[in-house]
Amino acid sequence: MKFTKSLLLLIVAVFASSNAAETFSNFQVTNSEASSPCVTTPVELKVNTCQSACGSILNVLPVTGSTSKFTFNQFGAQDTKCAATPTSSNEFTCVDGKSKVAIGSTTYSVVCVPDKTNSSESDSSDSTRIGASFALAAAALLSMIAL
C-alpha cells in the first residue's frame, strides 16, 4: 500500500513538472535586407500563438496542414518603426530548422517573445511549480526507499 502511494506521488510529480510550459504572445522578425531593415515587436499574426515547428524553432501557426510553411504580415520598408498596417501577408518556409526563414531572396530571423502578462505563466510561478514538483518527487522517492 505504501509503495502504491509513493508510486502515485512520483507520477503526479512528473506530470506537474511537464505541465510547466512557457507561453508566447509576440514575435520579433528581423529583415536581412540592409536597404530595408525592419524589426517588428510584435509581428502582426494571423493567429497570435507560438508553436514548436521546423525542428527546434518556435514559429507562428503553420499554414493549413503544413509543417514547414507559416504566415505573417510583412511591413513596408517605408515604415521604419514597423507599427503601421502591414502591406501584405506572406507565407514563409523554414530554411535551416533553427532560426531563419525565407521569402523569395529575403531571409528573416524569427524569435518568439515570451508572454509575461499572464501571471500564471510568469517565471516565478514556473520556478515555484517546478520546485514543488521536484520536492514532491524527492518525497516520493524517499518514502519508496524507506519501504
Swiss-Prot record:
One of its GO terms (molecular function) is actin filament binding. One of its GO terms (cellular component) is plasma membrane. Keywords: Cell membrane, Glycoprotein, GPI-anchor, Lipoprotein, Membrane, Signal. The keyword Cell inner membrane does not apply. It is a lipid-anchor; GPI-anchor. The keyword Zinc does not apply. The GPI-like-anchor contains a phosphoceramide group, rather than a phosphatidyl group. It is found in: Cell membrane. Residues 1-20 form the signal peptide. It comes from the Eukaryota. Residues 119-147 form a propeptide. A lipid is attached at residue 118 (GPI-like-anchor amidated asparagine). Glycans are attached at residue 118. Belongs to the ponticulin family. This is Ponticulin-like protein C4. It comes from Dictyostelium discoideum. The gene is ponC4.
